[in-house]
């Protein structure tokens, strides 16, 4: 088993939204960055993987097991941080430790308190006194403290200052040094994913638009800036999307080197994941 997670033709219909045949794989030892606008389908996909949303069609396998048939065994080995997951505010971090000891077979109190110390989280203070960033750190500490093989993280660095964010990213990178472990990381902070993700899956309006390695996206793709005259000479099969402004055209291309050889247009910008998202969503085919 080379893949720790496999999602095949996942579909789910709501009154005003539909997840349409979502498929992707997460190999062992890798970080997959899951990107898209709010409402694009990221959270529905994650909650389907976790069997929180279970009235879907398609197949999801985690650790080589069907997630519906093996829910309890699978969750024993998953560390979870959800954007809408909250601990009761009257509890303190020590209370969380007592609760988690009864939930996870492999709960490691020593490791948990080590993370609390690293994150400067007071053990005896009620969670209601914590800032948003402190609460997020507590969720991350909890997710890591039962020796999971897979981390599923929805906006894990939201609310963290740059120093704390870098600290958390370092912890995630340490986590996958064990080649049996992987991370599915959904985030709006695309610069984080540019540094740590091995794969990028881009979802929009319930459909997967791109699923590539990070290096392929950032090194091969590019945005060409050209005049209207130059744009009219470009074959429609040679670009993915374009945007027109008052003074120029911006054209998203899949292979900037090959494009430049063919058209000899030298104004090609290095792409970021944010650029890619904007062009894929706002650009014209």
Feature names for model-found ranges:
Residues 2-7, 12-184, 188-191, 195-196, ...:
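ABC transporter nucleotide-binding domains
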Residues 92, 213, 269-272:
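Short loop/turn segments at beta->alpha junctions
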Residues 239-285:
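C-terminal coupling/interaction segments
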Residues 13-16, 29, 147, 235-239, ...:
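Short glycine/proline-enriched coil/turn segments at helix->beta-strand junctions
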Residues 28, 228, 255-257:
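Non-catalytic surface loops within mature trypsin-like serine protease
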Residues 169-253:
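ABC transporter nucleotide-binding domain
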